[in-house]
Amino acid sequence: MNEEYDVIVLGTGLTECILSGIMSVNGKKVLHMDQNPYYGGESASITPLEDLYKRFKLPGQPPASMGRGRDWNVDLIPKFLMANGQLVKMLLFTEVTRYMDFKVIEGSFVYKGGKIYKVPSTEAEALASSLMGLFEKRRFRKFLVYVANFDEKDPRTFEGVDPKKTSMRDVYKKFDLGQDVIDFTGHSLALYRTDDYLDQPCCETINRIKLYSESLARYGKSPYLYPLYGLGELPQGFARLSAIYGGTYMLNKPIEEIIVQNGKVVGVKSEGEIARCKQLICDPSYVKDRVEKVGQVIRVICILSHPIKNTNDANSCQIIIPQNQVNRKSDIYVCMISFAHNVAAQGKYIAIVSTTVETKEPEKEIRPALELLEPIEQKFVSISDLFVPKDLGTDSQIFISRAYDATTHFETTCDDIKDIYKRMTGSEFDFEEMKRKKNDIYGED
């Protein structure tokens, strides 16, 4: 412990573990500590079920109907991986895929007028969908063809649109798309949580829709993947990688002090010993004075004994409740997985509802989602503060990750990882290396 390291990492959340893995691969000497006795920090998967009851201070033991406690791995933060997204690229680049198996999420659904509809995943499904009328479908198809052909580097594909200036609102107008289709596109395909994007330049939205389409094209049922045994496998996979490249790991280490001299971090004190470092990466829980609260997320873990109604008995799915449908500013999300992913006892389903808190009564805000899940066997409610670092860390060399947001995928987490990497090293995070090792990561069905 009393040694000199290039980088010390505090917390074993996904952001920290990926950065720790990448720094080790890059030849840095890394010490990685966590004050908790388990991996994953805020993004852990809790097992056995008894521990989840304790964590949420529920009295007594889980009932016998819940099956064996150790058959459960319950994610605290519900997220899926976009099949063609940045996290999958990071998994391939680092070959962490060899430690994990994935399944495709069976379907994505959208809420409209109190009912849920499947988000079409093929042209045939789109034509048969009752989400929009026939003429609307034709216009929508034209729009999707435009998006598919759009290439930032080729102005011939712009058709009079300036990707850096034209707003997304104007692009929708160009294709004469109605409000329902706009809601559906912005929230179910581009996966925006609010409507703020409408007046921004259209380039980002078009790229988001492309990511959705390309991810969907990989496996056909939905654009999402999920690891067997839960999301807690992700940080552990990257922690293994770090260890292979010489990183040192210590769990259950109380952090007494982060030592700063002349405004720069020089080490970390734990159990009376000091480990020295040039740079520090940590999550907000280790540096309360260096982060600020920018909002809250409510998450409700629901245990069910049945698949969600109107999902065709899917054993996994995502449901998006667009804000316009329930008079809110931000969308409500439901992520559902089950015993099929080795995260619950036989015949049991886990549905996690999440959204950005907007009122003094967050539990009321998510009622529309809970109604879709009835009957619910057991609920676990958490309201988490969203912390972000107060500064970039370039002066102190203390680089703080952002709290996990309410989105149902890891794209924003990956943006944070790339951003921290750039601030730490001065160079862009480079995916180019990955192309050499590109292979499919889809586990057996």
Swiss-Prot record:
The modification Phosphoserine is found at residues 130, 382. GO terms for cellular component: cytosol; Golgi apparatus; membrane; synapse. It comes from the Eukaryota. Ubiquitously expressed. GO terms for biological process: negative regulation of cilium assembly; negative regulation of protein localization to cilium; protein transport; small GTPase-mediated signal transduction; vesicle-mediated transport. It is a peripheral membrane protein. The keyword Membrane applies. Interacts with RHOH. Interacts with the GDP-bound inactive forms of RAB3A, RAB3B, RAB3C, RAB5A, RAB5B, RAB5C, RAB8A, RAB8B, RAB10, RAB12, RAB35, and RAB43; binds RAB3D to a lesser extent. Interacts with DZIP1; this interaction negatively regulates the interaction of GDI2 with GDP-bound RAB8A. PANTHER family: RAB GDP DISSOCIATION INHIBITOR BETA, RAB GDP-DISSOCIATION INHIBITOR. This is Rab GDP dissociation inhibitor beta. The gene is Gdi2.
